Amino acid sequence: MNILQEYRLKSTPNIFTREQCDEIIKNHTDYEHDVVRRDTALQSKYYDRKTLEENTEVIEDQNIRKVKQCSSNVITEWEGRPVYRCKVMKYEVGDKTDIHRDTQWMCQSNWWVPETNMVARDLVTIPLNDDYEGGQLKVENVRIKQKVGTAIQFAQSGDLDLPRALHGVSEVTKGTRYALVFWTFED
């Protein structure tokens, strides 16, 4: 099994047409900078949001480039699994996300919807445009081909004993990159 099979990397074409992607971009305008948090203790799918928050700290490092995001309800279910967190991410010139694994707090459903007691299984990203330069997606150090409207899915569990792929987006050097990003959840 190769590294990408281990992390269940798969691509599903034509989730949205280019026109639908343009409409998603047009309908999302209330962007805010992402808050960067770090887990300070092991998180549990049974914790409420207050407890999950108490087990994190906000990172105030000015060197961390904070990507803008806008909450969305475009996708609420994927492959029969609930989606509790969906957002449009906006990468402007100079924006990037370093290679990382998502922190546990964001992969616990109770942070987003109380008393659901689930953990993330997969992260899915759907490129919404391609009129930019840079902004390459990498999963486990492999550059992933991006096509507008195509879903790219890989393991990003909220359970530390299950697969959690390293991933990131290189710096955007020209234009603005938009992507719909969401997490699927399971018991």
Indicate residue ranges for each PLM-predicted region.
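Beta-strand elements of modular eukaryotic interaction domains
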Residues: 1, 79, 114-115, 143, ...
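Non-heme Fe(II)/2-oxoglutarate
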Residues: 1-87, 91-96
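Short beta-strand segments enriched in hydrophobic/aromatic residues
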Residues: 16, 28, 103, 128, ...
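Residue-level preference for beta-strand/loop junctions
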Residues: 80, 118-120, 161, 176
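Short beta-strand or tight-loop elements
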Residues: 84, 95, 120-122, 165
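Short, conserved beta-strand element in jelly-roll/cupin
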Residues: 88-92, 106-133, 180-184
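Histidine-centered catalytic micro-motifs
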Residues: 96-104
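Catalytic core of Fe(II)/2-oxoglutarate
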Residues: 131-187
